[in-house]
């Protein structure tokens, strides 16, 4: 491991220290390594041809104009990417779904875009993890 020196604005350093404390990092280096790994993983997973895993989470109103049916149709259209899906009833109107996906990251991103862009889907988030050798 190599030691490097970086220069940060006071505000950015304070934000880093607050993040480090909230997440329980022992030092700034651990926090910066995790932030950098996350940025590099996200960058590498945005390309077709990169295999990996992803977690897609989103909230939707289950009774909104065929939305549940459209989401299921999209899931079946991309069935080869789906490893597992967790469905949670948040309240009378809203559902949370969490899908674990595996495959070409370009295809995974396309699937996530198809789901998240549906009218009535809120809080859509895709977390990608490149396949490690």
From Swiss-Prot:
Binding positions (Ni(2+)): 76, 87, 89, 95
Co-factor(s): Ni(2+)
UniProt KW keywords: DNA-binding, Metal-binding, Nickel, Repressor, Transcription, Transcription regulation
Keyword Metal-binding in annotation: yes
CDD domains (alphabetical): RHH_NikR_HicB-like
A single GO BP: response to nickel cation
Listed transmembrane segments: none
Pfam families, sorted: NikR_C (PF08753), RHH_1 (PF01402)
GO MF entries: DNA-binding transcription factor activity; nickel cation binding; sequence-specific DNA binding
Cofactor note: Binds 1 nickel ion per subunit.
NCBIfam families the record matches: nikR (TIGR02793), PRK02967.1 (NF002815), PRK04460.1 (NF003381)
Family per similarity comment: Belongs to the transcriptional regulatory CopG/NikR family.
The protein's role, per its UniProt record: Transcriptional repressor of the nikABCDE operon. Is active in the presence of excessive concentrations of intracellular nickel.
Complex formation: Homotetramer.
Name of the protein in question: Nickel-responsive regulator
Lineage: Bacteria, Pseudomonadati, Pseudomonadota, Gammaproteobacteria, Enterobacterales
């Amino acid at each position: 491991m190599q030691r490097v020196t970086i220069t940060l604005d006071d505000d950015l350093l304070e934000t880093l220290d607050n993040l480090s404390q909230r997440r329980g990092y022992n030092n700034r280096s651990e926090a910066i390594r995790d932030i950098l790994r996350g940025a590099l993983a996200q960058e590498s997973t945005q390309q077709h041809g990169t295999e990996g895993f992803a977690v897609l989470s989103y909230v939707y109103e289950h009774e909104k104009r065929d939305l549940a049916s459209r989401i299921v149709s999209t899931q079946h259209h991309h069935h080869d990417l789906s490893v597992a899906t967790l469905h949670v009833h948040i309240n009378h109107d809203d559902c949370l779904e969490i899908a674990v996906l595996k495959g070409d990251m370009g295809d995974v991103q396309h699937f996530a875009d198809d789901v998240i862009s549906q009218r009535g889907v809120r809080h859509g988030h895709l977390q990608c993890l490149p396949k490690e050798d």
